[in-house]
């Protein structure tokens, strides 16, 4: 799991189905509040299903992240730069904006990895 660094032993089935969840890196409610309400239905559908915005992660961590932005949730330090870069790439692709608190958090993270490229 990129968010926690844990190895998840996953076997398809009822008892393990919550062990891995697909996260929207930019939560859909965050996207809505930062510009998605102004894009077309087609673009919103693409945003919700774009592999750039989808990531298989630890289920409980995803539930804890919920619809939080980068000012409220960051993964483990080793993945933060990639995570923030991915969020920015999604927001750029779909013309979403960043709140001031989100920007502060993103800048703080990206200052630790100045060579981080957007995916």
Could you describe each region identified by the protein language model?
Residues 1-57, 62-66:
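Betabetaalpha-Me/HNH-type nuclease active-site subdomain
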Residues 64-119:
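C-terminal, well-folded lobe of enzymatic/effector domains
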